[in-house]
């Protein structure tokens, strides 16, 4: 006899009340990824330029990074976040725009760190583009 299928109920997202957090900004040449975590590294909110509807070369613009930062910051502030430290990684165009957008939303930025990985002469970089 076949077993009866149970209804699966989806749990609602539980709002975590976190006052201090870390904003990780990963800015590449093609996209900007913003993740807001608590001090242990558990993700509270995230947003990317591509996730917001920017496609192609528009993903890498400072405006797209600004919109991503605002979106992630609003969700984090709904969870009670007030002060953040900022870790910036990568060479992209959206670095400064994302930090300014975070400050404009009302989050208090206590520290800004550049954690871009620098090779000790590791892999060969891609060749220069000739356009």
Curated annotation (Swiss-Prot):
What would you give as a GO molecular function for this chain, any one?
structural constituent of ribosome
The name on file for this protein is: Small ribosomal subunit protein uS11
- Pfam families documented for this protein: Ribosomal_S11
Q: Record's SUPFAM superfamilies?
A: Translational machinery components
NCBIfam families on file: PRK05309.1, uS11_bact
Q: Which GO terms describe its cellular component?
A: ribonucleoprotein complex; ribosome
Q: Which GO terms describe its biological process?
A: translation
**UniProt-listed PANTHER family:** 40S RIBOSOMAL PROTEIN S14/30S RIBOSOMAL PROTEIN S11
The family this protein is said to belong to: Belongs to the universal ribosomal protein uS11 family.
UniProtKB keywords: Ribonucleoprotein, Ribosomal protein, RNA-binding, rRNA-binding
**Assembly and binders:** Part of the 30S ribosomal subunit. Interacts with proteins S7 and S18. Binds to IF-3.
What InterPro entries does the record tag this protein with? Ribosomal_uS11, Ribosomal_uS11_bac-type, Ribosomal_uS11_CS, Ribosomal_uS11_sf
Q: What is the documented function of this protein?
A: Located on the platform of the 30S subunit, it bridges several disparate RNA helices of the 16S rRNA. Forms part of the Shine-Dalgarno cleft in the 70S ribosome.
